[in-house]
From Swiss-Prot:
Stretches for region Disordered: 124-170
Family per similarity comment: Belongs to the bacterial ribosomal protein bL17 family.
Low complexity bias locations: 124-134
Subunit structure: Part of the 50S ribosomal subunit. Contacts protein L32.
GO CC, one annotated term: cytosolic large ribosomal subunit
InterPro entries: Ribosomal_bL17 (IPR000456), Ribosomal_bL17_CS (IPR047859), Ribosomal_bL17_sf (IPR036373)
UniProt keyword list: Ribonucleoprotein, Ribosomal protein
GO biological process: translation
Descriptive protein name: Large ribosomal subunit protein bL17
Molecular-function GO terms, alphabetical: structural constituent of ribosome
Lineage: Bacteria, Pseudomonadati, Thermodesulfobacteriota, Desulfovibrionia, Desulfovibrionales
Pfam families: Ribosomal_L17
């Protein structure tokens, strides 16, 4: 009986399953969003959301716990310095799973995109602000334009050069 056994097995050994989920978590935190199967995305959410909660705590013990999963000091630093503060006032739900219309070619597995919810919203909100803040460059007068470069001509091939030399000799 499967009483109080949570989590999916994925037809893998426990060590393989743990390594797969940790690698998916690393990829998600590095890239912000990844494409995987729906079931892996749902399991990945169970790994990533506690990591972001640890990043909101921002103490030494939380960093060590995050390092146990990520096994990369640079990624732990990024998690605590960049990703954690973005979700500071959010009580949970740090990831979003978007189901894709097309299944995976080959085995017809249902695919999904899992992404960090705030990172895509903040990037979308900052893009118009950055566009407004960028100064508009003034157009240069036509007199200051650079002169047009002469068109490049093609060099004759060795066979054509021999044929032309033979014509000149005759």
């Amino acid at each position: 009986m499967r009483h109080s056994n949570s989590g999916r097995k994925f037809s893998r050994t426990p060590a393989h399953r743990k390594a797969m989920l940790h690698n998916l978590a690393k990829a998600l935190l590095i890239h912000g969003k990844i494409r995987t199967t729906e079931i892996k995305a749902k399991e990945l959410r169970r790994v990533v959301e506690p990591l972001i909660t640890l990043a909101k705590r921002n103490d030494l013990h939380a960093r060590r716990q995050a390092y146990r999963v990520l096994n990369d000091h640079a990624l732990v630093k990024r998690l605590f310095d960049e990703i954690g503060p973005v979700f500071a006032g959010v009580p949970g739900g740090y990831t979003r799973i978007l189901k894709m219309a097309m299944p995976r070619k080959g085995d017809n597995a249902p695919m999904a995109i899992i992404e960090l919810s705030r990172s895509s919203e903040t990037a979308a909100a900052e893009a118009p602000k950055a566009a407004k803040a960028a100064p508009v460059k003034e157009a240069k007068p036509a007199a200051e334009e650079a002169p047009a470069k002469p068109k490049r001509t093609r060099k004759p091939k060795a066979d054509e050069a021999d044929a032309e030399a033979a014509k000149e000799e005759n």
